[in-house]
Structures are given as C-alpha cells and as structure tokens.
Regions:
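Alpha-helical residues within the helix-turn-helix
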Residues: 42, 53, 82
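Residue-level signal for the short linker/turn that defines the boundary of a DNA-recognition helix
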Residues: 35, 45-46, 72-75
C-alpha cells in the first residue's frame, strides 16, 4: 500500500518522526498574551534590553518572546510581571478581558 493511501505524511515518515501539531505560540490566544506583555513593557517605559537586564537575560531572549518565537511558562510570566512593576494578577486580568473580547468577536 503506498504511503499516500495510508494517511502518513511522506516527509515525516521518511525521517521516522510523527507529524507535528500546530505550534500554540502562533495561536490567536497566545497573540493576546504577547500583546499584553509588550504593552506592559512599554507602559513601564522599558526597552527590551532593559527588561532583559532586570530578568538577567539577553535582549534577544525578550525579543524572541515578543515575536512569538519563545513561549513563556508561568514562573517566567510572574518574573516578567515583577520586573515590570505590575502584578501577575493584573496581567492575567488584562489577558482574560482580551480573550473574552476575542471569543465574543468570533
């Protein structure tokens, strides 16, 4: 039976890998998270480099987060909020409000 008839992706089958799921970093919902983080950084009057210095990271680390090339886990989210001088709760509320608006618009 040819691979095309089995539903197997020929590119991934030949490499011995399973097909990848869509990257959640590029979802509309995660775009909201990124937008809130970028807005909070700008509201704090910080450049990417200045925020990175507060986090003990490189400027490219923050840039990758903001471009959606790196996902933020909960602990890093809390550290970012603290470095911006805002509570993680406040950022989560902003995210929840925008996600609600996104859902209503759909």
């Amino acid at each position: 039976m040819p691979l095309a008839d089995t539903g197997v992706n020929i590119m991934t089958a030949s490499l011995g890998r399973t097909p990848r799921r869509p990257n959640p970093v590029f979802s509309d919902e995660y775009e909201v998270v990124r937008a809130v983080l970028i807005g909070a950084r700008r509201d704090a009057g910080l450049s990417q480099r200045a925020l990175a210095a507060r986090l003990g990271k490189t400027g490219s680390h923050v840039a990758m987060i903001e471009r959606g090339q790196r996902r933020v886990d909960l602990l890093e989210f809390c550290r970012i909020a603290d470095s911006l001088g805002v509570s993680a709760d406040a950022l989560v509320c902003r995210i929840a409000e925008r996600l609600g608006a996104l859902k209503r618009a759909a």
